[in-house]
């Protein structure tokens, strides 16, 4: 069996070179029908029943199941071994249809242009999905840097990188200045000034005016002496 296979692929190349696949072209629809082998493999129910009869018959009485095959495959019909390949006729629907796109076959008659879709580079070119996108967190600085952005055209990526770096620096400086001013506020805080402002903000009532007058009229406390002098408290003038 292996000798016949070797003879099929090596010895009988000249005989099989004359037979080539048939191509049926239809220029109108640009479809190409390729019929290399008109048959397909398969076993019918009747052939399964006849397998025992075929094995008992003589080798020369095999049916010509390879009649539809090329000459390169006819050597497999040698009856020294049992028949292991059987082919049936294939319907037309099981043939191969090879149709190239119209842009390759219609020449200049077609209006279809083969080009890359702009949606392919969406993740790279879209600014909203860029990693280096800077959100405007400094509205005051954006107005100040608007004039400088108009002078530099964002045509080259190097200029865009410089502009983004400048915006980062301006935002960092503004945040640092705000932080320092916030830290300096407690140093300038004075309790007396806060009390004065708080008292001025309060509404003037009868009791508040009376208390203010008492704080002004009362005498300061005398300094306690360390000697033997005993200081007696003065009588209370007001009961409250």
Curated annotation (Swiss-Prot):
It comes from the Eukaryota. This is Tumor protein p53-inducible nuclear protein 1. Ubiquitously expressed. It is found in: Cytoplasm, Cytosol; Nucleus; Nucleus, PML body; Cytoplasmic vesicle, Autophagosome. Induction: By adriamycin, gamma irradiation and H(2)O(2), in a p53/TP53-dependent way. At lower levels by UV irradiation. By TP73. One of its GO terms (cellular component) is cytosol. GO terms for biological process: apoptotic process; autophagic cell death; autophagosome assembly; cellular response to ethanol; cellular response to hydroperoxide; cellular response to methyl methanesulfonate; cellular response to UV; negative regulation of cell migration. The LC3 interacting region (LIR) motif mediates interaction with GABARAP, GABARAPL1, GABARAPL2, MAP1LC3A, MAP1LC3B and MAP1LC3C. Interacts with p53/TP53 and HIPK2. Interacts with PRKCG, GABARAP, GABARAPL1, GABARAPL2, MAP1LC3A, MAP1LC3B and MAP1LC3C. The keyword Transcription applies. A motif (LIR) lies at residues 25-37. Keywords: Activator, Antioxidant, Apoptosis, Autophagy, Cytoplasm, Cytoplasmic vesicle, Nucleus, Transcription, Transcription regulation, Tumor suppressor. Antiproliferative and proapoptotic protein involved in cell stress response which acts as a dual regulator of transcription and autophagy. Acts as a positive regulator of autophagy. In response to cellular stress or activation of autophagy, relocates to autophagosomes where it interacts with autophagosome-associated proteins GABARAP, GABARAPL1/L2, MAP1LC3A/B/C and regulates autophagy. Acts as an antioxidant and plays a major role in p53/TP53-driven oxidative stress response.
